[in-house]
Each structure stands twice: as structure tokens, then as C-alpha cells.
Regions:
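Cofactor-/ligand-binding subdomain signature composed of acidic, glycine-rich
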Residues: 1-79, 230, 284-322
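N-terminal small/polar loop signature for handling phosphorylated ligands or for N-terminal nucleophile
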Residues: 64-176, 182-183, 333, 374
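Short glycine-cluster motifs
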Residues: 382-398
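Divalent metal-coordination and catalytic microenvironments
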Residues: 35, 88-90, 142, 168, ...
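Functional cores that coordinate and move charged inorganic groups
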Residues: 135-140, 146, 151-294, 298-304, ...
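Gly-rich Lys/Arg/Thr-decorated short loops/hinges at beta-loop-alpha junctions or inter-strand turns
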Residues: 46-57, 81, 106-115, 185-187, ...
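Acidic, two-metal ion nucleic-acid-processing modules in DNA metabolism proteins
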Residues: 100, 105, 110, 241-341, ...
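Flexible, glycine/threonine-enriched loop-and-boundary segments that flank and lead into catalytic domains
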Residues: 344-371
Length: 578
């Protein structure tokens, strides 16, 4: 069975507000409660929530340095300077480069893009990239999804006669790089109203500002939004505020008139066209785009996303898909090796963390493997492999509530470099320092982690009876999308549930359950459910015993036909209490 989870029911929303909103909107009180949980308390707020409007996007010139950035881009275009669009090799970086490059290529042919090689140059702005720009006569570099800590690189570029505009969304340090403009909504001196844009989102605000300044119709930017929603979903930024608007219209573009490269990814992923969701991007499209940078080169991803014809897009997409299949094969093998190491006591850490090292593991998948180990053991996790020049590189993933970045930062004197955020980080150190690092970070984690952080939690939004899941309920619930951080798919709890006798094990190894569930109080209302990695409950369920289930409600499409299904988050035998 999977790691046992703790179920926590959210506090009930204010009953009077729920009742009023339910009456005003004519909706089930459970749906009204979900709205109040999301900060929606009035009819007007509900209308804005259910009907996102591009007119409500913030003025891009509210972002610090935006006027300087727009002016410098314009001077480069009218002065016939060469512009280099430079971005990270992950999905956020490659979509950002594709978006800004696609926009500027309409205005100048003196433009190119650059994605650093993951294993040669590493993350962010590189000296090699700047040298390449200088050798090829570029006068302006626009960085995307990177650069906020590239102080020395900016100075280096300036010494070679190259100006830089930084578009980033990561937390800056005390000293901001001395670039022509630094666009980052997380700058302390930036008054922009929404600070959780993706890197691609910051790039979009730049092209929005340029268009606004020089009379380019906003409508011409809408085709770029399919790139932006892929970035928002894949980088796991909040799907609230401005991101909710951008994601909503990005999905409309992706499901209506996607660019050739994304259409190829949809086809190669086996997804149903016109019904793509945030989850589809997170689990199907994003990993494929990421595979280019993990296994080959991020440049291939930009070539895919900027392809102008279907044949080219499908050719590149097919190659990227093959890289993704290779990535999955390597991922499975290394995950099993890492699990075996932990289970046989070959960890480099004690009981409060999971740290493993194998010099032969592929650097492109250690982050994925770290996530798998968190799922298995629910401890802060770092997976290391050998890099080059006597260095080891690691990818870190944390559990809810524990700041692993802070733990890594406490060992910074042992590191060559590191970066990331609360729950995910990357780091590099000399192999000779690995033992000392493991000992120190284990001590740091042991002193700060509490038992509550070591048990995964299922947050239950509301109790629900199956009889409430009507076509109207589903239609309104669908309007809560797009789901994501800050607006997660609601999780419901239904008690005293049985399988109708048709339940079975599914999956290559029979590890999952496909069930037809009924509730004792409503025996004629049955609903399909899928429970991943829960085959351990099969004997209990097959014997006709009751369970309680936590789940979200999803729509699955097959050949254009929608089917409602419960996606089970966790289940308990009926004698256990919440």
C-alpha cells in the first residue's frame, strides 16, 4: 500500500455567506462553499471568477524597469542591431524564448535565440553564451527565466559591448544586476500587483508593453497564449489572479488553434484535441518538451515551438517524443536502483531525510527520481550523481511545510553553486565535500522538521453525496477550471461507499483499481472511479465491505465523448475515522 495519509477537512466557510451565495447563483451549497474557500464572497466576484477577462490584465508598465526595457528593444530594432533571446532549457525557459522570439521576429530579422547546454553550461546565463553572442555581433541579449543573479555575467557582457535585459521571476538577491533593465515582479522595489508570473509570463508582459507603446493590437498577441499556458502549468506557478486569466485564454488557444509544434505534441501524446487541461500539460505535454533539454538540447524545444509548418513540427516532435521515451526508461531504472538503495540501508542520510548517490546516474532524470522517492518515503530528498571536473550535482525535493532551500543554503560554504525555492532546488559541490554536506544537512533537517511534516496530507474541501453529482453540478464545477496551485481541483469526501461488484485490478502489474462505486444511502447512483497504486484495498472491497473515499472529479474524453470519473486520492476501510 502507499504511504498512509492524514485527512484534513478544511474549516467550514461562513454559513451565512455560503447560503447567500448559493441562493444568488442558484447553485449547490457545496459549490458555494468552494467559492468562498477561494475568496469569492459576492455575485460580482463570482462573475469575475467564472468569466476571466483579458481586459483585467494589469498594465505592464507597472513593472519596474519596463519603460527602460521597451525603449532598449525599440532602439535595437530601429537601429538594426542583432538581438539574442536567451533562456533556460526547461519548459518555462523554452516557451518564454519561443514567445519573445516569435513576437520580435515579426519586427526584425536580426534576431536569434540561445539555449545553454544543460551539461556543458548549466543553468542560467553562461560565459560561453555571452562569448558566442559577442563573436556573432549581437548588441542586445534578452534573458528569460534566468539572469536575476547573473551580476558578474552582466558585467562581463557589458565589457564586450553587449547590453542585457533580464526577464526573470525567481527571487533576487540583495544586489540587482547592473543590466539595462531588470524585469522581475519579485523585486522588492517592484510595485507590480501580481508577483507569481512564470518566466514566460514576464516575457509576455514585455511584448504586451511593447505592443501597447507602439500601437500593435493586443489581439495579435492572443496566439502566443498557448505557449504561456504551457509555461504556467509546467512551472507550477499559482493559477490565480493574472495567471488565471492568462491560463484560461491560453487553454482556449491551445484547444482551438494551437501552434504547429504544440499540435504535434498533442497528437504524439495521444491526447484528445479540443479538450486539453492543465493536467494534460503537466503530465503529457510538459514532460515531452522538457525531455529535449534533459536528453539532448533545449534548442530543439524552441525549434519545435517556433516551427511554421506541420511537417517540420511533427518531425521535431517525433524526435523529442523518442527522447521522452528514453527518459522514461532511464527514469524507471534509476528510480528502482534508488529505492533499492534506501531499502537496503545504503542512504547517505539518517531517518529524517533521503539522500542517495550513484556516480553513473543520468543527470537529466535525478529531479524526477527525487520526486519519486518523496512519494515513496515522504522525506526531504536529494539525489546526487557525478558531474564533471570532480563535482557532483544533485536535485532536491521537499515535503509540504519544510523549506529545503533554507537547509541547502545553510551548507552554502560546502557548495560550488545552488538555486531553487522552497520545495525544489539544484546544487553542485566537490565530491570530497559530499560526506560533510550530508552530515550537516541531516543535522539541520533533524533540528527543524516536525512529525506533522513527515506524513502526507489529503486536504478535503467538502463532504459530498453521490446524488449531488448531477449534470448541473458538473457543468458548474467545470467552470472552476483551470485548476492548479492556488485553485486546486476540489477534493471531496464521500462516506460509506461500496463497489457494485464490477471492480477489478488494472495496469501492467495490477497495481491500480478500476471501480464502480455506489453509496449505501443512494444505491442506484453509481459512478466510475480509478484508484492508482491502491490495489492493496482490493480484497476488502471485493468482499463487499464499505470504504470512505477522497477524490476529485474529472472528465475523460474518448473520441469526443465525455465520461465522468472519480480520481481517488485516498481510501480507508470503513472502521477508520477521519
Amino acid at each position: 500500500m502507499p504511504v498512509e495519509k492524514k485527512w484534513i477537512k478544511r474549516e467550514n466557510a461562513d454559513a451565512e455567506t455560503v447560503s447567500r451565495l448559493s441562493s444568488e447563483l442558484g447553485i449547490d451549497p457545496v459549490l458555494a462553499e468552494l467559492l468562498v474557500q477561494r475568496g469569492v464572497h459576492t455575485f460580482s466576484q463570482a462573475r469575475s471568477f467564472f468569466r476571466p477577462d483579458l481586459a483585467d490584465l494589469h498594465d505592464p508598465f507597472l513593472m519596474k524597469d519596463m519603460d527602460k526595457a521597451v525603449d532598449r528593444v525599440h532602439r535595437a530594432i530601429v537601429g538594426n542591431e542583432k538581438i539574442l533571446v536567451y533562456g533556460d532549457y526547461d519548459v518555462d525557459g523554452t516557451t518564454a524564448v519561443s514567445l519573445v522570439y516569435s513576437f520580435l521576429a515579426r519586427l526584425t530579422d536580426r534576431i536569434d535565440f540561445y539555449i545553454p547546454e544543460r551539461y556543458d553550461e548549466g543553468y542560467g546565463v553562461s560565459y560561453k553564451g555571452i562569448d558566442w553572442a559577442a563573436e556573432n555581433g549581437f548588441g542586445l541579449i534578452i534573458t528569460l527565466d534566468c539572469g536575476i543573479k547573473a551580476n558578474e555575467k552582466v558585467d562581463y557582457a557589458k565589457g564586450k559591448g553587449i547590453d542585457m535585459i533580464i526577464c526573470d521571476h525567481h527571487l533576487p538577491e540583495n544586489d540587482i544586476p547592473d543590466a539595462v533593465a531588470v524585469l522581475d515582479p519579485k523585486r522588492e522595489d517592484c510595485g507590480y500587483p501580481f508577483d507569481d508570473l512564470s518566466g514566460c509570463g514576464v516575457g509576455f508582459k514585455l511584448v504586451q508593453a511593447y505592443s501597447q507603446m507602439y500601437g500593435i493590437p493586443f489581439e495579435s498577441l492572443v496566439p502566443l497564449l498557448d505557449l504561456l499556458v504551457v509555461s504556467i502549468a509546467s512551472d507550477l506557478v499559482s493559477v490565480t489572479g493574472e495567471n488565471r486569466i492568462l491560463a484560461h485564454y491560453g487553454l482556449k488557444q491551445l484547444n482551438g488553434e494551437p501552434r504547429e509544434g504544440l499540435l504535434a505534441m498533442i497528437q504524439l501524446s495521444g491526447l484528445e484535441p479540443m479538450h486539453i487541461t492543465i493536467d494534460d500539460i503537466v503530465f503529457k505535454i510538459g514532460p515531452r518538451i522538457n525531455a529535449a533539454g534533459r536528453m539532448e538540447s533545449g534548442r530543439m524545444a524552441v525549434e519545435l515551438l517556433t516551427a511554421s509548418d506541420a511537417q517540420t513540427a511533427f518531425r521535431i516532435g517525433t524526435e523529442i517524443n523518442e527522447h521522452n521515451n528514453e527518459r522514461k526508461s532511464i527514469d524507471r531504472r534509476i528510480t528502482q536502483e534508488a529505492l533499492d538503495m534506501v531499502r537496503t540501508g545504503k542512504c547517505l542520510s539518517g531517518g529524517n531525510a533521503t539522500i542517495v548517490y550513484n556516480p553513473h546516474w543520468h543527470k537529466g532524470v535525478v529531479g524526477i527520481v527525487a520526486s519519486r522517492l518523496v512519494e515513496a518515503f515522504y522525506r526531504p530528498t536529494i539525489v546526487f550523481t557525478r558531474s564533471h571536473g570532480g563535482l557532483v550535482t544533485g536535485s532536491a525535493r521537499s515535503v509540504h511545510g519544510f523549506d529545503l532551500y533554507d537547509a541547502i543554503e545553510s551548507c552554502s560554504d560546502l557548495l560550488e553553486n545552488f538555486g531553487g525555492h522552497l520545495y525544489a532546488a539544484g546544487l553542485t559541490l566537490k565530491e570530497e565535500n559530499l560526506t560533510a554536506f550530508c552530515e550537516r544537512i541531516e543535522l539541520f533537517i533533524s533540528g527543524r522538521i516536525i512529525p506533522e511534516m513527515q506524513t502526507p496530507v489529503v486536504d478535503v474541501d467538502a463532504m459530498l453525496n453521490f446524488s449531488q453529482i448531477t449534470p448541473k453540478f458538473l457543468r458548474i464545477l467545470k467552470q472552476f477550471q483551470p485548476f492548479g496551485p492556488g485553485n486546486g481541483a476540489p477534493v471531496f469526501l464521500t462516506e460509506n461507499v461500496y463497489d457494485n461488484g464490477n471492480g477489478r485490478k488494472v495496469g501492467a502489474e495490477g497495481g491500480h483499481l478500476k471501480l464502480e462505486l455506489i453509496q449505501e444511502s443512494h444505491p442506484y447512483h453509481h459512478i466510475s472511479a480509478i484508484a492508482f497504486n491502491m490495489a492493496g484495498f482490493f480484497d476488502h472491497i471485493k468482499a463487499g465491505n464499505p470504504i470512505d473515499v477522497c477524490y476529485s472529479i474529472v472528465e475523460n474524453y474518448y473520441r469526443g465523448t465525455a465520461n465522468t470519473q472519480l480520481r481517488v486520492k485516498d481510501m480507508r476501510e470503513r472502521d477508520e475515522m477521519i
